[in-house]
């Protein structure tokens, strides 16, 4: 029997700018990639093998696009499966708007959407943390946390049981200094 050729890749795997990627494996066997595009929306691509990618659509349409920062751009999505929902955390900001930017979330039943926006979780001026962007979700011991930050330090805060809002009474905790941006945490056994 002939051997199946091994697929290889060459960067870029998608031939246009998609910074701040977040990937999740869906129950349908596809890997789903969410990224920043032109700050107007969050494109979604999928792949069976992490080599060949196809465009699926965007997380939001013009009518469903978040608007808590009216002229704000969307970037740095973070996708997770919490319970039976796909939860998409996103940043919304205008350049120079370090006190009005913030982080919101949206949910969907399937990784390709459609996503229902739940609006802002917080803005920088509401929690006294300048430049609150670049979200990253993690769960540990049944507790849910959101990390974020961009050149003003990396912060963390505990979330509600469903992960869609801040836990009542939770306050931001600074976990890293001012020279860091874009949190990623990898668990190691």
Segments (PLM) and residue ranges:
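Carbohydrate-active catalytic/glycan-binding domains of CAZyme proteins
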Residues: 1-189
């Amino acid at each position: 029997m002939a051997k199946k050729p091994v697929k290889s890749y060459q960067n870029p795997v998608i031939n246009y700018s998609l910074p701040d990627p977040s990937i999740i494996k869906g129950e349908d066997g596809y890997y789903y990639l969410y990224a920043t595009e032109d700050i107007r929306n969050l494109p979604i691509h999928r792949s069976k093998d992490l080599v060949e990618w196809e465009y699926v659509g965007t997380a939001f349409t013009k009518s469903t696009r978040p608007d808590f920062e009216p002229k704000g751009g969307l970037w740095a999505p973070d996708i997770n499966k919490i319970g039976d929902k796909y939860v998409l955390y996103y940043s919304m900001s205008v350049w120079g708007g370090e006190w009005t930017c913030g982080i919101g979330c949206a949910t969907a039943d399937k990784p390709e959407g459609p996503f229902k926006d739940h609006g802002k979780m917080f803005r920088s001026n509401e929690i006294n943390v300048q430049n609150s962007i670049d979200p990253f979700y993690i769960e540990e011991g049944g507790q849910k946390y959101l990390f974020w930050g961009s050149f003003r330090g990396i912060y963390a805060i505990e979330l509600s049981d469903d992960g869609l809002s801040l836990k009542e009474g939770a306050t931001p905790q600074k976990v890293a200094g001012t020279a860091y941006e874009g949190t990623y945490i990898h668990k190691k056994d």
